[in-house]
Amino acid sequence: MYDGKQVVRVVTQYKKADLYNIGVEMTDRKGTGNYDKDRTIFNIEYVSLTQNNLYQEVKNNLKTRNIEYLNRPNTNLLNGVTFTSGPEFFQSLGMKFKNSGRTYHTGDKKGQTVMIPDIKSKGDITKAVSYFFDSCMEFLKEYVGEENILLSQIHYDEDTPHLQAYFVPVVTKVKRKCFVKDENGNVVKEEIKKKDGTTSIVPKLLRDDKGKIVYEEVNGKFLNCDQFWKDKGGLSLIH
């Protein structure tokens, strides 16, 4: 039995400017990886794009599902997750590896040979390996919501097999700051002094007896990365 590590890597801060490169890497297999074109045909697609590119996919998904979000350059539109392990794990599941002719330059394996999957036909991908990735995908669908997953693939054409997926972090409840209102229901404004010495007119926050800001819970469908992971108990729970 293999006792090494299985890796789950999550990235939570993909913004509009990041989506083009992600889409190119996933659909055209161009990017920072070591791609073997002879093995690309063995990649598996769980969830495919329905639009021309990843950004349009995100926009279409949010629009058709009536999901509220802040349309700003710094909005975290997408989360990414990768399930993988070292060659030893996949070898323990019956997959053959071969010498790449390269060595690791950093990390625990510095100086050691980089072993890559030896795949020449679908039969070289064992049922145990397929089951591992199928199980990862089922876990992901249950954990983040199948309807939130926009793109998901198994990549056998890089140095190490991995499942790579992208999803929108959608929640059904958010907490919003409350503001002081006058007798007519209008938000009260106040003048504040900034650090640079200038002043600004802003809505006056509602505070409790202890001076803490009062929040209200709002129901609906919202794209909110911070709240998504707070609801999950934090990123550490997925590792």
Task: Give the location of each predicted region.
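N-terminal nicking endonuclease/strand-transfer module with a His-rich metal-binding environment
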Residues: 1-238
